[in-house]
Amino acid sequence: MNLNLYGHAGKWLMVDCGVTFEKRGAINIVQTADPSFIAERRDQLVGLVVTHAHQDHLGGIHLLWDQLECPIYASPFTRHVLQSKLRRERCGAPVVEIPPGENLTLSPFHLEWLPVTHSTIESSALLISTEAGKVLHTADWKIDPNPVVGEAFDKNLWHSKLSEPVKAIVCDSTNATRPGHSLSEDELYEGLDQAVASSKGRVVVGCFASNIARLDTLA
């Protein structure tokens, strides 16, 4: 799960509000982060920004909404996924659409959305600026030269945006501590194509429903 808070000049910015993945057993359990710190200061909370449309980044919003009640910002695709979930959960939280590549000021924070490659559409990192300096919040990312969905890693864009030093990089990437490089999603197509072509019957493939890149590969 993900829930990050950035504070400056008596104000707070929240980035993502997710849940853990279900643990199957006698009782199916999902968990959210403990919101008590920011719930006690919600009059200082200027907004919640959702980086991408995965449950570990947005799945806790309907559960914690009555303790937050702040503006929510997301890209068009992320907003669509989030609103669908909110409707199912009968939560009326409004979500403001921010087109990819746009900037937003939620004083005292200035936010720049930077595209990153991930397994869903419109995933972004956030460059958060205040008078005290800049912090780069990556969210989930992958340097993939041939992504199936989304934009390829643009080295020139990142060099230009990070030409000035940042105070910190808050980095989130699954299996980032494992050595080596992950395969490009594009490299999976040939193997999947051969497996399906050689099958004499129906082929059933299981994957996360939110893995848009894998669904595109299978299609």
Cite the ranges covered by each PLM segment.
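His/Asp/Glu-rich metal-coordinating catalytic cores
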Residues: 1-49, 54-219
